[in-house]
Amino acid sequence: MNDIRAILLNTALVEAWPGGLLRARGNHDARLLAGADRVLRRKQDGRYLAVVADGVLQPLRPAFATAPGLDEAMRLVKGFRAHRRPGVEAVPLLPLQRLRERLDQLGIDGDDYAARTGLALVPEPQWLALAGFDRYQRPLWLHANAALAWAAMLADALRAGVILEAISGYRSHDYQLGIFERKIERGITLADILTVNAAPGYSEHHSGLALDVGTPGEPPAEESFEATPAFDWLQANAAAHGFKLSYPRGNPHGIAYEPWHWAYAPASTMGG
């Protein structure tokens, strides 16, 4: 997991992706991305801001040279050293910036939500490991410890004749905010959204320790997943790999049953 080419570097506003993983959006971008060691991508809208090649920053557009967060991302790119000490604490966490203001914009009282659901704010990790690719051939980013456990669990399931697929892994606060904004635009009420999605900042996906799991031929993130051999196998074996079902029926958080949502939570990292 210490291969710098397989690590996503994360800051409050900008992500630094390894070169070769993002698709170019036009010929101009394609030429720059082709030789990039890193691509700096704005988290809020996914826009590519700049590339880094041989330690040199090159904005994709002149106006992007002063984009907020670019300097912070570049400092991380230049100074990053992967941690070699095992354990969840080996990956630094980002400060919870701007989140309360953006929750207010959605009409969510963070303190009230936390009190009602028992969910805590979840910081994003400073870096994530490439854990393969999801069902849609998108890079799957997970906390380094979860990535190792996921690989071991995939192999164990395959030996038993069960195919597990990742549907999604790490999601930033900005990504979760986008889910809410799009659903609100479609006319879905905030109360209804909160029954199926944790409020931005409160999702386990922010930690990189959680992922949605599927199996071939089964639609993603549907309750019908519980009727599959893959779910039966997870119920019997996931705990041995450190994974737990986060939202069973009747969970105390008020979130609908999600048989597909599993989080890496070995006893040693959960206080017992």
Feature annotation, model-predicted:
Residues R171-L177:
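Short, well-ordered surface patches within globular domains
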Residues M1-I167, R182-G272:
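Extracytoplasmic cell-surface/polysaccharide-interacting catalytic and binding patches
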